[in-house]
């Protein structure tokens, strides 16, 4: 019995070893059973655009030679789906011109695709497009199956020719979600009523399925939307779906850009009063349509909105409603007459307060223009509301048709209303048309004037229309620390202005017994460059010859000022001048230079008043300590603007 027990133990151990070896062998064989097949990456040509491919995420192989400029690319980083897929891949740096595999993912459309030159490809700008895409290196995500055959929106694909109208693949995996199979069906035309997002072009109804109920391709799951980096609006993968606020004209081509030489934001105020009658109202609409056609409307050129007035004004459509001439003409034709009085003043006030806003499509950098059409004369006053419009930067034009005859003057609420309303009373902004039948002759003259942006004087504001020259005391009494405080004061004033070559320009002179030009008006064209230049000014040290410094600034700085710029000199000193300041100050006045005199500590107030432009109380300032200098900056800016807004209108 003692021999049997060890034998049984040996048998048990032998069985356990066999089972262990068998299990290990079985585990080694398991991976072979679940090994994934090799990924097949479809190849595309250089000219294939992302918008032609329905799949929301896919891998493709690009051939060599896609760097050719004939393969257009729109955007930088995020590309409009009208772009060449392979061209965008080269531009982004994912590929070079030898070709290769890439990963493509569709994202929502956006506004403002910026062009740039990168990796031998010049991408173009585009105001907006309905769908975008991004490209990345071809590194498949774990657990994601990419389509081996692409589904196109056109029937000219291999899949369509072979009758393969449906391809199945899996959605990209998203953390926290379960991968669902997605089915894409070859695009077929469907009625607009069947589509959630309305489109004026023919939509196609490719279906995306992640549940038993089919959904349009234009819709993605909530999980997909949550991981999108760009979310300006609805996510639109279907190139047939376009929100109507994004594009008024649906086309497979980029939207018309408009005339870049006439970039204005224009509001037409049309007369819808009862007195104009139906026939003349139709003539007015035809005139408006002819002007719109001549302007060449587009996002890079002029934009037009229409306000109709009677008893009260109403916006027919704003600046961003229609982005090309043809759509505008169609919209104008549909305008119906309101009736009522001719309350022009109320309409101008309405436009000033509400029309030129960002929400209505105002672009900020484009001049604001209002063209007011009047049959006869207004039934309310226009002078005060027009003054507010001018001060708001609106260039008001008046077209008066069949104005008051001598016998009718007594009935006019405000005689000379047009001259009181327009931007300038120099004839440039007024049209007096004798008959509605001759109104068509005004089309070209009006277009020429509203597009002459250099003469749109009311676009100029106190912050964007001056040449400002600082004349800075660098004498020994200043000291290094106080001089830096003065430079900070100069920077604080400068940053309040809109600085560019066509807006406000800034220059600086430093003086002691001698003078030197730190930088002229044409040296720097941006606010950042100006502020940087001010910081770099070095302290000179020496005497105080303010009179000579004024004369030097007139000759070396303001002599190069532009004719249409307001010339403003700001003198900053901490002591009495060693030389006479009266004659140089008079010379500045005679040359049209507005002088502000800023005195600190030991500066002589009587001398400040001599140098300052009349009235001295508005143009001379004194602080007893350098640390209080910053306090007067807002008052100086306010006075500059008050003076600008009160300038003679001629």
UniProtKB/Swiss-Prot annotation:
Deletion phenotype: Embryos show decreased spinal cord size associated with reduced cell proliferation and altered cell differentiation in the central canal of the neural tube.
A Gene Ontology molecular function term of the record: glycosaminoglycan binding
Domain named VWFA is located at: 265-450, 467-640
Q: Which SUPFAM superfamilies match?
A: LCCL domain (SSF69848), vWA-like (SSF53300)
Q: Where is the signal peptide?
A: 1-26
Region annotated Disordered sits at 198-226
Return the protein name. Vitrin
Q: What is the lineage of its organism?
A: Eukaryota, Metazoa, Chordata, Craniata, Vertebrata
């Amino acid at each position: 019995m003692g021999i049997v027990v060890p034998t049984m133990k040996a048998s048990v151990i032998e069985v356990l070893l066999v089972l262990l070896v068998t299990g290990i062998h079985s585990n080694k064989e398991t991976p072979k059973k679940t090994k994934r097949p090799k990924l097949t990456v479809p190849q595309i040509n250089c000219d294939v655009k992302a918008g032609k491919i329905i799949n929301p995420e896919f891998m493709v192989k690009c051939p060599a030679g896609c760097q050719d400029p004939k393969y257009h690319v729109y955007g930088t980083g995020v590309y409009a789906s009208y772009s060449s897929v392979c061209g965008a891949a080269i531009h982004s740096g994912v590929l070079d011109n030898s070709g290769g595999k890439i990963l493509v993912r569709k994202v929502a459309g956006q506004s403002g695709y910026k062009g740039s030159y990168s990796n031998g490809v010049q991408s173009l700008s585009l105001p907006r497009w309905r769908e975008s895409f991004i490209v990345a290196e071809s590194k498949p995500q774990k657990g994601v199956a990419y389509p081996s055959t692409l589904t196109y929106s056109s029937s000219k694909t291999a899949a369509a020719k072979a009758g393969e109208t449906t391809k199945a693949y899996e959605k990209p995996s998203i953390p926290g979600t379960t991968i669902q199979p997605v089915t894409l069906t070859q695009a077929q035309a469907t009625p607009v009523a069947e589509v959630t997002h309305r489109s004026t072009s023919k939509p196609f109804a490719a279906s995306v399925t992640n549940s038993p109920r089919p959904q349009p391709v234009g819709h993605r799951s909530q999980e997909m939307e949550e991981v999108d980096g760009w979310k300006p609006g609805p996510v639109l993968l279907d190139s047939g779906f376009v929100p109507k606020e994004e594009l008024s004209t649906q086309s497979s081509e980029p939207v018309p850009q408009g005339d870049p030489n006439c970039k204005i934001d224009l509001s037409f105020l049309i007369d819808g009063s009862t007195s104009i009658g139906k026939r003349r109202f139709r003539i007015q609409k035809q005139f408006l349509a002819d002007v719109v056609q001549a302007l060449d409307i587009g996002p890079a050129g002029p934009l037009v909105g229409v306000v109709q007035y009677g008893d009260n004004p109403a916006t027919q459509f704003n600046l961003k409603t229609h982005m090309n001439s043809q759509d505008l003409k169609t919209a104008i034709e549909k305008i119906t007459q309101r009736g009522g009085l001719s309350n022009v003043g109320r309409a101008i006030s309405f436009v000033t307060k509400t029309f030129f806003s960002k929400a209505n499509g105002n672009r900020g950098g484009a001049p604001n223009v209002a063209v007011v059409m009047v049959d006869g004369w207004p039934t309310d006053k226009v002078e005060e509301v027009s003054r507010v419009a001018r001060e708001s930067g609106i260039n008001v034009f008046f077209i008066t048709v069949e104005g008051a005859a001598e016998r009718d003057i007594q009935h006019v609420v405000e005689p000379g209303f047009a001259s009181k309303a327009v931007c300038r009373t120099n004839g440039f902004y007024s049209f007096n048309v004798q008959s509605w039948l001759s109104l068509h002759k005004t089309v070209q003259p009006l277009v020429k004037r509203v597009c002459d942006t250099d003469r749109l004087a009311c676009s100029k504001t106190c912050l964007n229309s001056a040449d400002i020259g600082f004349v800075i005391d660098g004498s020994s009494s200043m000291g290094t620390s106080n001089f830096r405080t003065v430079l900070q004061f100069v920077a604080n004033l400068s940053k309040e202005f809109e600085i560019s070559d066509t807006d406000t320009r800034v220059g600086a002179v430093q003086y002691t017994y001698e003078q030197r030009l730190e930088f002229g008006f044409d040296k720097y064209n941006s606010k950042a460059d100006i502020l940087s230049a001010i910081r770099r000014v070095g302290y000179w040290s020496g005497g105080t010859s303010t009179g000579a410094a004024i004369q030097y600034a007139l000759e070396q700085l303001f002599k190069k000022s532009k004719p249409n710029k307001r010339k403003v000199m700001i003198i900053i000193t901490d002591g009495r001048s060693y030389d006479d300041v009266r004659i140089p100050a008079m010379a500045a006045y005679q040359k049209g230079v507005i002088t502000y005199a800023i005195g600190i500590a030991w500066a002589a107030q009587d001398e400040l008043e001599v140098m300052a432009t009349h009235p001295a109380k508005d143009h001379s300032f004194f602080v007893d300590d350098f640390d209080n200098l910053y306090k007067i900056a807002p008052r100086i800016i306010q006075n500059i603007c008050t003076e600008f807004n009160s300038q003679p209108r001629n």
